[in-house]
Amino acid sequence: MSCLLNALQKEASRKLWFRGALWLAVLGPFFFLSYNFAGSLAEVRQIRASLVFGWERWIPFRPWTILAYWSLILACIASFFSAWGIFSPDARPGRGDPDRERQRLDRHGERLLLCQLLTVACFLLMPLRFSYTPPRVEGFLGGFFAMLYAFDQPYNQIPSLHVALLTLIAARCSLGGVWRGAFNSWVFLVGISVLTTWQQHFIGALAGLLLGGLVLWAVPDDGPTLRTLWREGRSARDDPDRRVLARIYAAASFACLAWCVFGWACWGSGAAAIWLFLAWSGLALGLTALVYARLGPAALRKRQGGLPPASLWLFWPYLAGAWLNSRWWTRGRPAPDHVADRIWIGRMPGRRELERLAASEHGFDALLDLAAELPAPASFAGGEDFVYAAVPLLEGAIPDPEDVGRAVLRLDRLHRAGRTTLVCCALGEVRSALVVAVWLSFRSGAPLADAVAGVARRRRGVALDEARIQAGQAALRLLLARKRAGDLAERLSRWRAGQREAIKKSFHNSHEMASNAGRES
């Protein structure tokens, strides 16, 4: 059996290598053809425009960093072949799940393809050129520069495809410990090399980093891709609040990007920090508009209380604003309020705040997180007994009844387990209040309006409008219908068990009667 398993695992590993070679055979030619096409078109159009900050003239030219620059090509090739466990240790024979590694390999290929498509589209829409002339390099290093200049012209500046690919390669690395530190040092050196070999300006390198984060967010290792979220997402047409918020974020994104263009024209590179902040905010708010318009809370990729690096990198202006908004509106009442037996409502706590709550006389030992936009202190070192649960909901949007029902069931399980639970969102006034009110109505059978009024008496600032109460009513109907269906299934199961026992008993009695009759005869 062991030999058979080893043979199957080796065969799966060979298939992975063949799959990686197939991806490489498709992406390699496409990379060179599309990149050269964009550069040649810019040369024909005689592009002279460039985006460069004044301080970049102090960046030194370091010829030896061309070795790091070229090493990325080898890393891209190795990333498709699980290079000795650097990129996918679970793919080696005898280790891990080949099906999962095949999915990760395909996602990696999709990322590189999407990255190339977006990059070339940017090159065609916004052609720029490098504004300096690199000095001539002779000797051993000069050969590497000659190979580079043979296909790479001083165009294709924003975003930096080199930095974008480096971001994707770094995300695929699976090393740990000292080797991870060495790998990170290599990543840093390759990233710096695009500047010290005078191939890219700073704004192009930063744009490449942003593009890499965007691709990682759109095509994660696990979970639905952006295409799946768009296809399965709930349109904002049926939710006026989501529709209004999507338009507000879209307008804010347009305003930031317009000010970004206007600011560059007026201020030049003298206000680089402001320009970068406006550009980043425009991107973050534009993506937030998509989240509200179609994608839903799953697009923020929140897991175990935290947001992945790609989401933090892309959305940080929006996330920072959401956190500041939460702290500003709850500055006078940061403490949670007791609304039912072992159930409390409050804002999303910080780590220290949660530590104080856990050490208090109430002894909080569970957290139900309803805020899609705020990271939770899920790494709280309160021992293994502390329970974290989450059903992310969008701030300001009318929640889906299915999501409300899931949150109510999780709260009910925590309560039945004897947990003292803090139900939290950004302010502790809308999402948390709705879930707790539906849970109270579900448990007690009281009208939802009475449960909402009871929560509002305990937590100042609770305000649930008619649309949210209707969503709560729909969630309550779903929960009650499922409970009745579950009760019916349980009664049917008991009836079937009783029937089986009756049949067994009848058969046993018949057998005894036949045995007695045989003995009498």
What is each residue range found by the language model?
Residues 1-76, 135, 293-307:
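N-terminal transmembrane-helix/juxtamembrane module of multi-pass inner/ER membrane proteins
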Residues 1-17, 89-100, 224-245:
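Membrane-interfacial, low-structure loops and terminal tails that flank and connect transmembrane helices
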Residues 32-33, 116-122, 185-198, 256-262:
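Aromatic-anchored segments of alpha-helical transmembrane domains
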Residues 40-50, 54, 84-181, 190-191, ...:
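Membrane-interface loops
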Residues 68-75, 160-165, 206-210:
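Membrane-embedded alpha-helical segments of multi-pass membrane proteins
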Residues 141-148, 323-423, 427, 438-483:
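Cysteine-based protein phosphatase catalytic domain of the PTP/DSP
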Residues 157, 188-215:
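Interfacial helix-loop-helix junctions of multi-pass membrane proteins
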Residues 223, 227-325, 334, 409-420, ...:
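PTP/DSP superfamily signal
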